[in-house]
Amino acid sequence: MNPRDIVEQVTALAEPVAEQLGLQLVAVAYQTHTKPATLRVDIRHPTEGTGLDDCEKMSRALEALLDTRDDLIIGAYNLEVSSPGVERVLTTDREFMAFRGFPVMVKTFGPVDGKKQWEGRLLERDGENVYLTIAGRRVALPRPQVARVQLVQSLP
C-alpha cells in the first residue's frame, strides 16, 4: 500500500478514536525515509492545552486498533503521537478547521493593503481567501498572496 493510502486509512481509523477521547485529530503523516518507517499522528485538545496524558491515551488506543489491521502497514514502524507545536505552520484544510479562533501570523508574498505581515485570530480558509479577525474586524487575504500561516502564542 502506498503512503498516501496509508495516511487516508489511518486518518479514517484515528478520527473516531480521537473523538472518543475528547480530542481532535490534526494531521497524520507516514514517513518512509526513516528506518523503521514513522507513523506520526498530531492531536489537540479543543478546549485546553494538550498534555502528555492525552498523547499517551491516543497512542495506546490507536496502537491497539492498528494491531488488529496487520494488512495496513507491512513491516516495522514507529507510532508517534504528539500535539502540534505552538508555532506550527498551517497547511491543510484539516489544520485550518482545527485551529479556528487561534492567534496566527500571516505573511504574504507582496503587500496587501500596504502590509506583508498580518496578526489576528484565524476565522477560516476557503478557495479564495484566508480570513482573520483583527481588532474586531474581518479581514480577507487572497490565498494566492498568502505565503505562510503560522500559529503564535498570543497577539500583540
Swiss-Prot record:
GO cellular component: cytosol
Gene3D superfamilies tied to this protein: Ribosome maturation factor RimP, C-terminal domain, RimP-like superfamily, N-terminal
Pfam families in UniProt: DUF150_C, RimP_N
Biological process annotations from GO: ribosomal small subunit assembly; translation
Keyword Hydrolase assigned: no
UniProt subcellular location: Cytoplasm
InterPro entries according to UniProt: Ribosome_maturation_RimP, RimP_C, RimP_C_sf, RimP_N, RimP_N_sf
CDD domains found in the cross-reference section: YlxS_C (cd01734)
Annotated keywords: Cytoplasm, Ribosome biogenesis
Function of the molecule: Required for maturation of 30S ribosomal subunits.
NCBIfam families named in the record: PRK00092.3-3 (NF000935)
Similarity field: Belongs to the RimP family.
The protein's name in its UniProt record: Ribosome maturation factor RimP
